[in-house]
């Protein structure tokens, strides 16, 4: 049996999240409250039902500083992230919905775990070990068809199995999904575990591990939308983002990387 293991840590977001400075309402429209010190906890309730009638849980992680992350089993989605700014005011800094129904029809991948393959595959085709595989073409930027974010029913549209955990200075949830051989056209049975961990240092860490029983292609990504002001009605045009990169990948008219590695300046 052949296996493949992938680990994708998401850089801790404490530096970015501490910069939100809006004292108004959160993106979910909830009034702001002062952080409750020392009230760290993990809880779970039913968030809603999938189209086939299965229950989807939502897990609420709260740290010692009042920071709170909500994650649902549907799509391994980050539903909300409420964090204190430098003045201690709480705000939800990610976009999402108050109920599961919003995600059942959403096509923007708010907060989702995207896979098996995040981003685009030209013409919905790839060749592996001499064999060509054909995938659904569910996107067409510039009128050029491609396979996007795992296909018609990617990781963002399936029900994962969640299990919470607690440790010293942290608490989190492991979400597991087994994608059968041939699902959305991909080879190999793939077992994926996504972990969200909220620490008492105001870090939210996202990590994905995947094991396949056959050679396959894989690119699992997290797809949250951020507005560090905590006000979803405002633009992010005044946000500043620094990337420590010397090169980037240019894309063609269909938003497919050309293969060129270009300098940033």
What role is predicted for each listed range?
Residues 7-8, 14:
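Polybasic/polar functional segments that serve as interface/processing modules
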């Amino acid at each position: 049996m052949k296996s493949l293991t992938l680990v994708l840590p998401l850089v801790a977001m404490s530096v970015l999240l501490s910069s939100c400075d809006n004292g108004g309402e959160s993106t979910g429209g909830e009034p702001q409250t002062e952080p409750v010190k020392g009230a760290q906890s993990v809880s779970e309730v039913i968030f809603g039902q999938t189209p086939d009638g299965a229950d989807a849980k939502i897990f609420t992680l709260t740290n010692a500083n009042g920071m709170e992350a909500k994650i649902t089993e549907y799509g391994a989605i980050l539903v909300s992230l409420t964090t204190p700014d430098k003045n201690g005011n709480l705000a939800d800094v990610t976009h999402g919905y108050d109920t599961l129904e919003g995600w059942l029809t959403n096509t923007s991948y708010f907060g989702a775990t995207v896979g098996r393959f995040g981003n685009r595959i030209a013409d919905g085709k790839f060749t592996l070990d001499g064999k060509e595989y054909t995938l659904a073409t569910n996107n067409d930027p510039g009128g050029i068809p491609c396979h996007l974010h795992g296909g018609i029913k990617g990781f963002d549209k399936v029900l994962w199995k969640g299990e919470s955990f607690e440790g010293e200075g942290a608490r989190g949830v492991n979400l597991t999904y087994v994608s059968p051989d041939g699902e959305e056209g991909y080879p190999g049975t793939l077992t994926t575990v996504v972990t969200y961990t909220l620490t008492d240092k105001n870090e939210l860490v996202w990590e994905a591990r995947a094991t396949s029983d056959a050679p396959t292609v894989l690119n699992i990504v997290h797809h949250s939308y951020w507005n560090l002001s905590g006000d979803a009605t405002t633009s992010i045009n005044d946000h500043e983002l620094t990337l420590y990169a010397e090169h980037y990948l240019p894309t063609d008219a269909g938003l497919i990387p050309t293969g060129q590695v270009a300098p940033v300046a």
